[in-house]
Amino acid sequence: MRIASCELAGRTGHEAGRQLLAELYRAETGEDLPEIRVTERGKPCFVDSLWHFSISHTPKHAFCALSRNNVGLDAEEADRRINLKLAEKILSPMEKRQFDAAENREKALLTFWVLKEAAAKLSGEGLRGYPNQTNFSLEDPRVTELDGCILAVMEE
């Protein structure tokens, strides 16, 4: 799997993400980006390629993961302000205990959020239903910080 990031630099997140995808795809395959379609559940995918991708953007950055396996990626600016009351709606009881004990609860909530979004993108289901039914850890190795953002990447 390869991951790339860039600043938006006047582009929309969509434009920057697609440019990253095209650059990664060309670097890996030597080919132009194949046609992209959206599944009935809303997940973008290539029409005729064995490669998979996931794109995320924040107000300042775009990120793209390209893999031979199904992949889901999400990112949030690490300094983003987030309503801590959201924890009651999206965290499982196990996650809530970790959140309550965290030194930096905003960062903890953003970490759980990107994990849940990355998992939703991986499955292609989105966050429909009950995000508080999943259990993640603040120590999850699929979370990293890159370019001032908290990033979660999951791969099947």
Where are the regions a protein language model picked out?
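Core catalytic alpha/beta fold that binds nucleotide/phospho-ligands
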Residues: 1-156
